[in-house]
Amino acid sequence: EGCVFRQMTSGASGGIWVRNWTDRVESRNIRFQNCEFYKSGADELLAVWGWSGAVRDVVLSGCSFYETQTQEALDADHCPVWFITLGQSGTTDVRMEDCTVRAEYCETIFRMVGDKNRAVVDNCDITMKQPDSMAKHDMKKGANPMLARGNDRADGSTVIQNSRITLSGDNGRRICYQLSALKGNTLDVSLGYGIASTKEVSGNTIRGRIRHKVFQDCSGVENNNVEVRRFSILG
């Protein structure tokens, strides 16, 4: 509680990992409260996942997460693919609430994959503004979500809700991909594509500029307030 974590090596790997090395016992009741996390370099800032076993009842509450890339990291192209992992392999049960996230150079803020994953992001303030100097993305070479990639399940296991989200990226970027649910959020966006392959999209306010479809291959799209202009981003 109240700790500050700085990983400023600008290296190719390393971060804070909450995981279990064995399936013989479970790890439970892990809390980070009112902490600050700073990261320069590749790999995640924070990763929570069961790995060889299970981690349950993990809570991140009132914390702040900052991507603070040094010039050394940028010159070496040491930027994270995933900024925060909330589930990957093994069994994961994690909740992130009342947190602040600020990112720039990472490919995707949240990785929330795995059939045995339950991850909820609730009431958070999330901002990612891709710098003009960052290499442009090609939708033919990947989904390129800025906010999150989920586990493609319709059981409510990977959810982002009740949050304030600001995203700015190039014409090959989309908001999110394969979440169980995106609901009750306010999104201010400027990017190429919207929400894709998400099982429930409800009660969101979506404002800004999107070049292509706002919703693509989504089910359960209802009660959203969409105020979006279509445009073409240079580059």
Give the positions of each predicted feature:
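Short glycine/acidic-rich loop motifs that flank beta-strands on beta-rich extracellular proteins
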Residues: T9-I16, F37-V48, T68-V81, S89, ...
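Short, solvent-exposed loop/turn segments that connect beta-strands within catalytic domains
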Residues: G11, D23-E26, G53-V55, Q71-D75, ...
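Extracellular beta-strand-rich solenoid/capping regions of secreted or surface-exposed proteins
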Residues: V18-V25, G50-S52, T85-Q88, M112, ...
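All-beta strand scaffolds that present successive hydrophobic residues in beta-strands
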Residues: E1, S27-F32, V55-S61, T91-D98, ...
